[in-house]
Amino acid sequence: MAQVSINSDYSEWGSSTDAGERARLLQSPCVDVVPKREGEASPGDPDSGTTSTLGAVFIVVNACLGAGLLNFPAAFSTAGGVAAGIALQMGMLVFIISGLVILAYCSQASNERTYQEVVWAVCGKLTGVLCEIAIAVYTFGTCIAFLIIIGDQQDKIIAVMAKEPDGASGSPWYTDRKFTISLTAFLFILPLSIPKEIGFQKYASSLSVVGTWYVTAIVIIKYIWPDKEMRPGDILTRPASWMAVFNAMPTICFGFQCHVSSVPVFNSMRQPQVKTWGGVVTAAMVIALAVYMGTGICGFLTFGAAVDPDVLRSYPSEDVAVAVARAFIILSVLTSYPILHFCGRAVVEGLWLRYKGTPVEEDVGRERRRRVLQTLVWFLLTLLLALFIPDIGKVISVIGGLAACFIFIFPGLCLIQAKLSEMEEVKPASWWALVSYGVLLVTLGAFIFGQTTANAVFVDLLA
């Protein structure tokens, strides 16, 4: 077996325990990962975790499914219909699963337990910094999307409570979207975002799962038994151009991006073996694919090209079953925002402390003041942007490109570097095949990131 010599300059900027909580960064809300100490079991040790194989499947599905679900019917419309949407997702699934397996392999090789630590250890300091910056921007953008989703659902719920028809004008000031989003954010999200720890993670995850499955069920049921007043728009059967297909990529990448939280899940397993993990992620992605396809196909066929970027906005306000779905989504987002903010704040904190060369063991008062300041700046910026961005589609079009980096580029770079580090005089055909596949991942990821980001900037944001 080839020996592997992974880059070791990760330690130049500090160990994985700096920035207060780096070892817990971006782990799945259902997984408790204990920072490594000398003498602890490595990721390959059978006694290194407590999560069963079935439990790991559930956690990965939980990490994958989320708010991006609401945008999938619009993604099918953008891609050019059901056939194009299905083909795009099926083609992407191979790369999504392989990226998850690559990360597990590199986690074993580097003995690291979180996504960014694996990238640091395998690819070096520069790539590690870029990875952490990407995580910070991605979580920031996702928080903006969460606030927009809250506004979308509140608009419909308030319309029912005020007994106003959809699209009515001249509403009272206290029903204005900007006011309701701001009030909800200050009353609920900000207090939950300031604490150093977020002990409600597991409850929030369970709520998110219930809400996601309920939304999927409602969309499918409403397609099978539609309301009489609902009339679909044009049902596209083919994409307008090949570029239109790629415009659906951000939603798919955003929806299936669970790679950042996958490494802690892998290391939490009782038997964290790459072969077992391959079965786990394959089963999890098939389940997620079924949920996303069910929502995307049925939502698109119900409304056609007229579907809203947030599919729940396309349904009448007075529909009780859909109103329950909206309430589920609001509760889920209210608890998910602090979790994403916690992850982004930890990245920013780590980068800042390493840049300043400040030890973690500083006085508690300075840490508390800095945490409150970081939280307020993060919260106010995301709120301000959410108030003036009209729909989640525009946000997902931007952060979906970053999701492609986590799915394609960083796993591809890790695979290339891991294989290049092997001490073998004669390289077998499998070695060249894996290196070539790594190059393919990086190239494809760079193309998706560049194309979707450019399209988001010049078409969506500047339109």
Swiss-Prot record:
InterPro entries: AA_transpt_TM. Its main location: membrane. It holds the Pfam family Aa_trans. The lineage of its organism: Eukaryota, Metazoa, Chordata, Craniata, Vertebrata. It is found in: Lysosome membrane; Cell projection, Axon. Keywords: Amino-acid transport, Cell projection, Ion transport, Lysosome, Membrane, Phosphoprotein, Sodium, Sodium transport, Transmembrane, Transmembrane helix, Transport. The gene is Slc38a7. GO terms for cellular component: axon; lysosomal membrane; membrane; neuronal cell body. Coiled coil: none annotated. GO terms for molecular function: active monoatomic ion transmembrane transporter activity; L-asparagine transmembrane transporter activity; L-asparagine:sodium symporter activity; L-glutamine transmembrane transporter activity; L-glutamine:sodium symporter activity. Symporter that selectively cotransports sodium ions and amino acids, such as L-glutamine and L-asparagine from the lysosome into the cytoplasm and may participates in mTORC1 activation. The transport activity requires an acidic lysosomal lumen. It catalyses: L-asparagine(in) + Na(+)(in) = L-asparagine(out) + Na(+)(out); L-glutamine(in) + Na(+)(in) = L-glutamine(out) + Na(+)(out). The chain crosses the membrane at residues 56-76, 82-102, 130-150, 179-199, 206-226, 240-260, 283-303, 320-340, 372-392, 396-416, 429-449. The modification Phosphoserine is found at S28. This is Sodium-coupled neutral amino acid transporter 7. Interacts with the mTORC1 complex; this interaction mediates the recruitment of mTORC1 to the lysosome and its subsequent activation. GO terms for biological process: amino acid transmembrane transport; asparagine transport; glutamine transport; sodium ion transport. Belongs to the amino acid/polyamine transporter 2 family. It is a multi-pass membrane protein. It comes from Rattus norvegicus.
